Structures are given as structure tokens and as C-alpha cells.
Amino acid sequence: HLLQFNKVIKFETRKNAIPFYAFYGCYCGWGGRG
């Protein structure tokens, strides 16, 4: 899942860096593995 998120994030960050990264960043940061 990490690889997928990495690709998606890299692609999406160009459009919605703040909302997208913030959502996944918080989720994964709080211990949301996969």
C-alpha cells in the first residue's frame, strides 16, 4: 500500500498538496498502516 500511496501522493500533491497530503499524512501518521 505504501508504494501505491507514494505514487498517488506524488501525482496528487501537484493538484491538491494540502488536502490530500494532510489527510493521508494524518491518517498514516496516527498509525494507519495500509
From Swiss-Prot:
Binding-site residues for Ca(2+), renumbered to this chain: Y27, G29, G31
Keyword Glycoprotein: no
Keywords: Calcium, Disulfide bond, Hydrolase, Lipid degradation, Lipid metabolism, Metal-binding, Neurotoxin, Presynaptic neurotoxin, Secreted, Toxin
Tissue occurrence: Expressed by the venom gland.
Broad class of enzyme this protein falls into: hydrolase
One BP annotation, GO: phospholipid metabolic process
Enzymatic reactions: a 1,2-diacyl-sn-glycero-3-phosphocholine + H2O = a 1-acyl-sn-glycero-3-phosphocholine + a fatty acid + H(+)
GO molecular function, one term: toxin activity
Enzyme Commission code: 3.1.1.4
Coarse class of the protein's main subcellular location: secreted
Gene Ontology CC annotations of this record: extracellular region
Pfam families, per the entry: Phospholip_A2_1
InterPro entries: PLipase_A2 (IPR001211), PLipase_A2_dom (IPR016090), PLipase_A2_dom_sf (IPR036444)
Family label: Belongs to the phospholipase A2 family. Group II subfamily.
Protein name (Swiss-Prot/TrEMBL): Phospholipase A2 B1
Source species: Micrurus pyrrhocryptus
